[in-house]
């Protein structure tokens, strides 16, 4: 039996409102949609950064992806969505041992959020008086095994960025207060969006995103008309619009599931490894994270397309999104990093 794709957006009061805009109904923005799908196939890619103009569907695409994601198995009531009882943190009070299927967590990290809201809060008085580890889990606990979404991530406060960097590197959240220590797994796909006109992202956080995509407003009339038409139809009757696009959304979900099964079997021949290395050397990228992300993304694309091995075409397709945000700025090159990668790909991998 097929699981319905619809997922309702919670309102500020907690009430459920209309369903999210379907992923398959988003017009254009193919690079952005592909980058999000690749992280759904292989979360180990490391997340997606989407920078671009306002009103280009950045937030819509992220929330639409959430409705597509396959469910996960987790212990009922576990605050970190542990897959089995043995992995439940010792501080968590979980009354059930049942393993249930639940939606993949997608958690918003709002601007201006406090540190305790992100990492969780310790009740020191209760710990001292009763000897109990009283811990209120934060957003990182909720995001474990799912997605953490940051809109306008370039406006995040520095101390929150530092927290995210530490957790993204270790995969574990550690909260220490007055000699007490709490820890729990915090492995999630980081998805950030923002407008470059509002400020740059710190290089340390920028490098933690596996893929980076630039989105622009469509420049041709036909595309803009189609965007208007679909949005107007959705606003008039969201449920009917969702039903119309449900089959295509279900096709995409099935593609994700099938690609996940194929992924471990996709081979990376030596020619692909040499292509990765040659391209990164030509671009002058620092370290090896670029090559590793490039190869991993190409493998996910191959799995998504049903291929058995990574080919040059796969590498060329994902090179810009995997490498453009890792380049040093060249003040003499006015074309920008995206154009530099595209140009170098054509020269190095003809």
Curated annotation (Swiss-Prot):
| E.C. number(s) listed in UniProt | 6.6.1.1
Give the family, as the similarity comment puts it.
Belongs to the Mg-chelatase subunits D/I family.
* Pfam families reported in the protein's UniProt record: AAA_lid_2, Mg_chelatase
Q: Which UniProt keywords apply?
A: ATP-binding, Bacteriochlorophyll biosynthesis, Chlorophyll biosynthesis, Ligase, Nucleotide-binding, Photosynthesis
Provide the reaction this enzyme catalyses. Answer: protoporphyrin IX + Mg(2+) + ATP + H2O = Mg-protoporphyrin IX + ADP + phosphate + 3 H(+)
* UniProt-recorded Gene Ontology molecular function terms: ATP binding; ATP hydrolysis activity; magnesium chelatase activity
Class of the enzyme per the UniProt entry, highest EC level: ligase
Among InterPro entries, the record links this protein to: AAA+_ATPase, CHLI-like, ChlI/MoxR_AAA_lid, Mg_chelatase_ATPase-isu, Mg_chelatse_chII-like_cat_dom, P-loop_NTPase
SUPFAM superfamilies, A to Z: P-loop containing nucleoside triphosphate hydrolases
Protein's name according to its UniProt entry? Magnesium-chelatase 38 kDa subunit
Matching NCBIfam families: BchI-ChlI
Q: Where does ATP bind?
A: 52-59
Query: Is-annotated flag, keyword Nucleotide-binding?
Result: yes
Pathway listed: Porphyrin-containing compound metabolism; bacteriochlorophyll biosynthesis
Query: Would you kindly state one Gene Ontology biological process term found in this protein's UniProt entry?
Result: photosynthesis
What is the scientific name of the source organism?
A: Rhodobacter capsulatus (strain ATCC BAA-309 / NBRC 16581 / SB1003)
Please describe what this protein does. Involved in bacteriochlorophyll biosynthesis; introduces a magnesium ion into protoporphyrin IX to yield Mg-protoporphyrin IX.
